[in-house]
């Protein structure tokens, strides 16, 4: 193990901005999350909220997607910012983009991610139990990972979160460790399958993803999909009588809002 120094002027500017944020908040409990958010779904949101409750400042290291079907980095940064701005306390979350840095490109080495978090002064690192390369196993019913020794040697707490699912019996997002119902009640947040739906132009149900996130993704991968989008919008949805141009993103958001309506006979 050791320190990682990235010689990149853009990264250096981001680091300076981070330290200013840390100083302004007088943050002592700083937690790191490293993910590709490809795509950003409700289980990620649950992880965010759990982390924010226990930290003065959360650093989100956004890494490149490692598979050919992955979303563009700028697109991911766009919907991540939109989500944080709308649904989380943005002053307590710092996005640290790791764009075009091959060292973290595959999001496969949690040890490197731990060193990165420690080098920035983080006191905790949160990872999911399904993180590739974590090497998780149980010894006397206690979870063990390859990061256990690193955590002790470098004085950074590593928290391994269990898998989050939506339970149709509990009617909420739960961890697989806390839910008493079987897997036949669980909806899983599988990133690859959600991407396949979006790539096919199918809107994932709101239980999987926020409408703002789905709208940004669909409007990006299907630009100008509807030649007469304005007419479709005006013909289907309520308006204030003033003809206003609606973007693809606004159209998808309105469509998703309508999907969530309940129909009463």
Residue ranges and their predicted role:
Residues 127:
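Short beta-strand and adjacent tight-turn residues that come in two discontinuous sequence segments
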Residues 1-108, 114-123, 132-265:
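Non-catalytic terminal extensions that flank enzyme cores
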């Amino acid at each position: 193990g050791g320190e990682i120094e990235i010689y990149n002027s853009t990264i250096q500017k981001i680091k300076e901005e981070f330290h200013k944020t840390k100083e302004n908040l007088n943050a002592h409990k700083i937690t790191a999350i490293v993910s590709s958010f490809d795509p950003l779904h409700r289980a990620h949101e649950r992880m965010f909220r759990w982390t924010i409750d226990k930290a003065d400042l959360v650093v989100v290291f956004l890494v490149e997607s490692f598979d050919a079907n992955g979303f563009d980095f700028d697109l991911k940064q766009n919907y991540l910012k939109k989500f944080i701005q709308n649904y989380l306390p943005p002053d307590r979350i710092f996005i640290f983009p790791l764009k075009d840095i091959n060292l973290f490109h595959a999001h496969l080495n949690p040890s490197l991610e731990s060193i990165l978090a420690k080098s920035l002064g983080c006191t905790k690192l949160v990872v999911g139990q399904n993180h590739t390369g974590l090497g998780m196993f149980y010894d006397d019913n206690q979870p063990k990972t390859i990061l256990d020794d690193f955590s002790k040697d470098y004085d950074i707490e590593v928290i391994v979160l269990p898998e989050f699912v939506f339970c149709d019996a509990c009617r909420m997002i739960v961890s697989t460790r806390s839910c008493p119902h079987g897997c036949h009640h669980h909806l899983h947040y599988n990133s690859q399958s959600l991407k396949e739906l979006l790539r096919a132009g199918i809107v994932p149900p709101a239980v999987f993803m926020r409408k703002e996130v789905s709208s940004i993704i669909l409007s990006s991968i299907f630009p100008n999909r509807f030649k007469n989008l304005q007419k479709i919008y005006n013909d289907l949805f309520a308006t204030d009588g003033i003809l206003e141009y609606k973007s693809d993103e606004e159209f998808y958001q309105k469509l998703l809002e309508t999907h969530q309506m309940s129909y009463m006979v």
